[in-house]
């Protein structure tokens, strides 16, 4: 649910009714836009980091999210964010914010333990988007710093995207994590205006991740006792499929993937 209270003030509330069998509150924030190039956001949201992890569920291209979006870079949190847009012949969009740093599953007061931040810059060239971002969180006594870079090419019905994420843990608590996601998609419009299906989109993806830890220790300890647990083991994956986009008034996609 999203809407405007006034011209300058908007809101969004988004709920996932089945995230691995659980109902989760995803977004719950207020956004103030005092003028066209500036916006302020406060509340619970997807932090400004990565390309694919920043997409809401209905904006995803595949039935299952990439490893960057689901495991390595998947961070929603509570905080405050500022965004500004410049036009230097092409738009440059910069978003940065300070956040709780513990994620949605463990909302504690982390402000006294240091600043947890996220920042993202988008360079929107004609047909090409370049995105660079960084984030720092502290889910336990370990500081986790992430760096992400990605590029998207889009022309007509064709889109290609490649993204790389690097994750570093302080105190040498865990080895560095690497993740990659790349996909191609092509939209084929259906000529018959009376057809239930408006477009057909064949697509393919390759993604990879090394052994990954979310920064918490076995037993849930906030001290240096115990090793960081491996939440997700190293894996490679190739996904292919087709998306059937149905007619309006509601945007509805049927995603068939293997």
Model region roles, listed by residue range:
Residues 1-101, 113-115, 121-129, 183-187, ...:
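Outer membrane beta-barrel
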Residues 39-46, 75-80, 110-115, 141-149, ...:
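Phosphate-binding glycine-rich loops and adjacent basic patches that engage nucleotide phosphates
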């Amino acid at each position: 649910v999203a809407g405007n209270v006034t011209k300058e003030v908007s809101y969004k509330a988004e709920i996932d009714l089945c995230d691995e069998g659980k109902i989760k509150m995803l977004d719950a924030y207020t956004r103030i836009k005092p003028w066209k190039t500036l916006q302020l956001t406060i509340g619970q949201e997807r932090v400004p980091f990565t390309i694919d992890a920043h997409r809401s569920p209905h904006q995803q291209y595949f039935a299952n999210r990439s490893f960057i979006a689901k495991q390595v870079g998947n961070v929603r949190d509570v905080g405050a964010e500022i965004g500004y847009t410049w036009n230097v012949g092409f738009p440059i969009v910069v978003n940065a914010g300070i956040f709780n740093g513990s994620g949605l599953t463990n909302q504690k007061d982390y402000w006294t333990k240091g600043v947890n931040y996220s920042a993202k810059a988008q360079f929107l060239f004609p047909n090409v988007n370049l995105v660079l971002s960084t984030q720092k969180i502290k889910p336990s006594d370990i500081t986790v710093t992430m760096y992400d870079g990605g590029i998207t090419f889009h022309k007509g019905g064709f889109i290609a995207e490649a993204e790389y994420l690097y994750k570093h843990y302080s105190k040498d608590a865990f080895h560095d994590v690497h993740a990659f996601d790349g996909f191609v998609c092509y939209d084929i419009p259906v000529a018959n205006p009376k057809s239930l299906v408006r477009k057909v989109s064949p697509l393919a993806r390759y993604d990879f991740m090394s052994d990954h830890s979310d920064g918490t220790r076995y037993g849930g300890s906030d001290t240096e006792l115990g090793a960081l647990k491996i939440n997700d083991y190293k894996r490679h994956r190739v996904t292919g499929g087709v998306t059937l986009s149905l007619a309006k008034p509601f945007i509805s996609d049927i995603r068939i993937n293997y």
